[in-house]
Amino acid sequence: LVTTSSKWTLPPGTIVTGRWKGERYLIQRLLGQGANGVVYLVKQMKSSRLYALKMGFDTIDLQSEINVLKALQRRKRKIGSTGKRDLSYLVEVDDYSLEGKEIPFYVMRYVKGEPLRAFLAQQGSRWLNVAGYSLLQQLEGLHGLGFTFGDLKPENVLVSPYGEVELIDYGGVSENGRSVRQFTEWYDRGYWGAGGRTAEPSYDLFSFAVVCIHLLAEAPLKEVATGLPQTRSKGDLLAIVQGEASLQPYRKWLERALEGKFRSTAEARQLWREQVQKQVMQRKAKSPTPAWMMGAFTLSLLLLLCALFFTFWN
């Protein structure tokens, strides 16, 4: 057990046994740590299935998060969401006894993958096209249920080898119209004086725009992010988008997201798809990239788009 400032992490190999239901989970590794808890990759002992398990630093805070996830489940059942992909938000809720304390935890489904930053470092920044589209699909589904993710940042986005995205750590998920429960400053539009912290689709789209800037133009973002609050503004972000070559393929989308001009997440997803298709066509026309490599990337993109289409519309 590692403890720092009342926060702790459990090492790989630790077995977490639920006090009430008795399920046993073997910790594989740490997936992420936020303001209100830690998320682990775990293996259920009886089935060997992998899940994401979150433990909370504060019982009341985590219970509030669990209540939001349960509300998501109820809303999804009421709407009658269908599809082949399992989109369950909760697998199990229980307590873990540690050093005389009861630590609440919940278990969620897990998609094997890497954090977004690590994925792009391995595969290349071009794969943001695929992962970004999948992320917008995830957000569109969440927004359609009446909720905003809130704490959208690279650490909370896992990407499978084929670019499929899974959101982890739902600590910031908030019902639309209410205040965002949890956020990270750099990705918060209030931090940039670009709007309030009301939970709504445009809040997540703004956050994703800053995530893109962070991943593709980190140095200039760091420079303006550390400035004085009274001088920091949305205009700084727009200037980076307009001035950095790495962001030009996404310029139109990023500007609209930062300005809050998308009418819906579906519209944002559609524009993202259009800009990806445009990039593919341009590369086919002039890129020296080997044909086999371009074909592999294009095929992966098409397969993902088809899979996502049938998942959400069947």
Go through the PLM ranges and name each one:
Residues 131-132:
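Activation segment signature within eukaryotic-like protein kinase domains
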Residues 80-104:
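Short beta-strand micro-motifs within the conserved protein kinase catalytic domain, predominantly
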Residues 278-314:
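C-terminal single-pass membrane-anchor helix
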Residues 24, 28, 35-67:
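ATP-binding glycine-rich loop module of kinase domains
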Residues 171-240, 249-251:
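C-lobe/activation-segment region of protein kinase-like
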Residues 100-115:
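Conserved short submotifs of the Hanks-type protein kinase catalytic core
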Residues 1-20:
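Juxta-kinase regulatory segment immediately upstream of eukaryotic protein kinase catalytic domains
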Residues 139-160:
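Catalytic-loop of the protein kinase fold
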